[in-house]
């Protein structure tokens, strides 16, 4: 995958207003894996894009009334079919982590990139999602090498608030695919 000005060239771009600048001289050193489905447990549809762009209709579903006021975004979403949607360029600070801490450092949004997988904690993720997550991760490691040793779940940086990506996310599979992909890049 190619990067241009912080954007994945092959992703669908849906710019979110919910971001700002990282602190001065701060580069991404952490990748946070999340999940999202809107309405909860349902896949497809325009609702994730609408949430991350601040345009979700609070009357379209009872749950949306609870979240319509939120100003949040992820850097990217990987849909069930493997489509990659990017909301925030990687050099900017997306608002995905909330109150969080990683290895003693607070405010993970300052130094992380957030990737949402369309899914739930208990619904197995698709092959296409793992493949695209590996491809995006490899691209990010190429640009921000420190990420290679710092990939975690939202539940690990905000354990009292969050459970995603949940037990359905196969970390062993992801790491094996990432290692295999890295080996192919080298040879």
Curated annotation (Swiss-Prot):
Describe how the cofactor binds. Zn(2+) is required for amidase activity.
Keywords of this entry = Cell wall biogenesis/degradation, Cytoplasm, Hydrolase, Metal-binding, Zinc
- Main EC class of this protein? hydrolase
Any single GO CC term annotated in Swiss-Prot or TrEMBL for this entry: cytoplasm
The reaction(s) annotated as catalysed by this protein in its Swiss-Prot or TrEMBL entry are: Hydrolyzes the link between N-acetylmuramoyl residues and L-amino acid residues in certain cell-wall glycopeptides
MF terms from GO for this chain are: metal ion binding; N-acetylmuramoyl-L-alanine amidase activity
Q: Does the keyword Membrane apply?
A: no
A GO BP entry is: cell wall organization
Name the positions where Zn(2+) binds: 34, 154, 164
**Main location class:** cytoplasm
The site feature described as Transition state stabilizer is recorded at 162
Compartments in which it is found = Cytoplasm
User: InterPro entries, from UniProt?
Assistant: Amidase/PGRP_sf, Amidase_domain, NAMLAA_amidase_2
Q: Where is the active site?
A: 116 (proton acceptor)
- State its Enzyme Commission number(s): 3.5.1.28
Where is the N-acetylmuramoyl-L-alanine amidase domain positioned along the sequence? 29-167
Q: What does this protein do?
A: Involved in cell wall peptidoglycan recycling. Specifically cleaves the amide bond between the lactyl group of N-acetylmuramic acid and the alpha-amino group of the L-alanine in degradation products containing an anhydro N-acetylmuramyl moiety.
Task: Tell me which PANTHER family the record gives.
Answer: 1,6-ANHYDRO-N-ACETYLMURAMYL-L-ALANINE AMIDASE AMPD (PTHR30417:SF4), N-ACETYLMURAMOYL-L-ALANINE AMIDASE AMID (PTHR30417)
The family note in this entry says:
Belongs to the N-acetylmuramoyl-L-alanine amidase 2 family.
This protein's name:
1,6-anhydro-N-acetylmuramyl-L-alanine amidase AmpD
- Species source reads Enterobacter cloacae
């Amino acid at each position: 995958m190619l990067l241009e000005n912080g954007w994945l060239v092959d992703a669908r771009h849906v710019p979110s207003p919910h971001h700002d600048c990282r602190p001065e001289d701060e580069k991404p050193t952490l990748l946070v894996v999340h999940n999202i489905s809107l309405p909860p447990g349902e896949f497809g549809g325009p609702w994730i894009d609408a949430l991350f762009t601040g345009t979700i209709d609070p009357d379209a579903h009872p749950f949306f009334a609870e979240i319509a006021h939120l100003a949040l975004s992820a850097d990217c979403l990987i849909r069930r079919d493997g489509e990659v949607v990017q909301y925030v360029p990687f050099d900017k600070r997306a608002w995905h982590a909330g109150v969080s801490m990683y290895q003693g450092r607070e405010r993970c949004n300052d130094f992380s990139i957030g990737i949402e997988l369309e899914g739930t904690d208990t619904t197995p993720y698709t092959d296409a999602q793992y493949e695209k997550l590996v491809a995006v991760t490899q691209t990010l490691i190429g640009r921000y090498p420190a990420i290679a040793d710092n990939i975690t779940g939202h539940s690990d940086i905000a354990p009292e608030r969050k459970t995603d990506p949940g037990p359905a996310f196969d970390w062993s599979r992801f790491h094996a695919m990432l290692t295999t992909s890295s080996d192919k890049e080298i040879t």
